[in-house]
Amino acid sequence: IHLVTQQRKNKNYSGCIVTNPNCTSAGLTVALKALDDAFGVKKVFAVSLQALSGAGYPGVASLDIMDNVIPNIKGEEEKVEWEPRKMLGKFNNGKIDLADIRFSAHTNRVAVTDGHTVCVSVELTRQTDPQTAEAILRDFSAAESARELPSSPRPVIEVRNEADRPQPRLDRMTGKGMTTVVGRVRRDPILDLKFVVLSHNTIRGAAGGSIYNAELLVSENLL
């Protein structure tokens, strides 16, 4: 919201340009935000398994992806390593100061129609245990200004306790595709915690996220 006001001031116009984050960063950062608020996040190691729909149309050639995993998505790793730091950063003197988080990402294209899965390990500033982290994730809520908007995810984060969840086919439409689903929260022997994040890339990460942004701008009398 502060960036919209600053943009109008800088450009001397009444409109605004609002961009969505990368569809992988969108869901991942929701989970990181909850943990960062509670414990502080110092380091993130993330491996994405990204759906075919994220490649757009006409997408990935069928003979390239059938019976296969493509271990590189051009330009994606750089986005996933940078965008969450911006989203978790602070507005300061007309710009965003990036969050002080060290980030490493691998991005992979997999033969899934919709739903990006990210396997995440984090190092925290303040130690915690998996059960407490699960409770923090489960109780996380949107900013007060966004909680009652029509597209606001309900819940923001759903925590699954099954050993084999979340899965794209089973969980991507949770909260009409706007909820971020987290599972397999456990201790990490190298960092502190590890877990799996699933979000619907074309709903939460694209069209639904755009509508959510527009609703927020209307509610704040910026449109």
Annotate each PLM feature.
Residues 194-198:
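Low-complexity, intrinsically disordered segments enriched in Ser/Thr together with acidic residues
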Residues 77, 203-207:
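Short, charged, low-complexity patches
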Residues 108-112, 199-204:
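Glycine-rich phosphate/pyrophosphate-binding beta-alpha loops
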Residues 27, 129, 205-206:
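Secondary-structure boundary/capping motif
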Residues 1-72, 102, 126, 180-181, ...:
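N-terminal Rossmann-like NAD(P) cofactor-binding subdomain of oxidoreductases
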Residues 42-192:
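C-terminal substrate-binding/catalytic lobe of Rossmann-fold NAD(P)-dependent oxidoreductases
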